[in-house]
Amino acid sequence: MALSFKNSSGVLKAKTLKDGFVTSSDIETTVHDFSYEKPDLSSVDGFSLKSLLSSDGWHIVVAYQSVTNSERLNNNKKNNKTQRFKLFTFDIIVIPGLKPNKSKNVVSYNRFMALCIGMICYHKKWKVFNWSNKRYEDNKNTINFNEDDDFMNKLAMSAGFSKEHKYHWFYSTGFEYTFDIFPAEVIAMSLFRWSHRVELKIKYEHESDLVAPMVRQVTKRGNISDVMDIVGKDIIAKKYEEIVKDRSSIGIGTKYNDILDEFKDIFNKIDSSSLDSTIKNCFNKIDGE
């Protein structure tokens, strides 16, 4: 008894069917005699931010320079350029679109930026979360360095974080990857970006995209609710308060009102002989609103 098997590409025919079984030689197979291969262990993730930050020979100036020039470095990434940085006594090699691997010093762009953020925050004496003790502790970094006045985080400035603001250097691409050492800060900053997404003009397809990087880091530590409890929701709330405190509003409405006040002050200082009808009408409309 012959038998036909239909699939998306056509029909396969077997000559005989005996007791419900087809003889393998009756159907042409593309892959046969399967041979087992051991799993590729290159997928093991060797990256550890905390371990790298315990390395000797910090070149912290490179971290400040990298965040300052992050726009140029990001363009290099977009152009698929591999980059190398001397952050320690060994090089950090940055490969665009890199997947997790066994190497400790070959990283993706976002992880490299997280490393720079971590170095700077260590230098700024931020406390580090100890997962074993479930609390924040002093970091033991003793590096003595005064950053150049020219160093700045342009992305943070555009979001209202001045150079004096505690989170000026933290608000950068890849901050989510500092979760192992700054979990409350990462969660609070993700909450800030989500809640201020319109003001910050963040582009996204779905709201979940705004917190997805943070969620991936949280779930590495366990159940979301449990991790939140370990870190401490009260602590997360305090970190959020720190983020929004003394931040300059960048809302267009606020800035529009501010500039109108300045315009009115200037208007009052202009000699009446220089005031044409156009500018008078403009200010009459403003005062009449």
Swiss-Prot record:
User: Cellular component GO terms, alphabetically?
Assistant: viral capsid
Q: What domain of life does the native source organism fall in?
A: Viruses
N-acetylalanine carried by residues: 2
Its localization reads:
Virion
Task: List the keywords (alphabetical).
Answer: Acetylation, Capsid protein, Virion
- Indicate yes or no for the key word Acetylation: yes
Family, similarity comment: Belongs to the high plain virus capsid family.
Q: What is this protein called?
A: Capsid protein
Q: Which organism is it from?
A: High plains virus (isolate Utah 96)
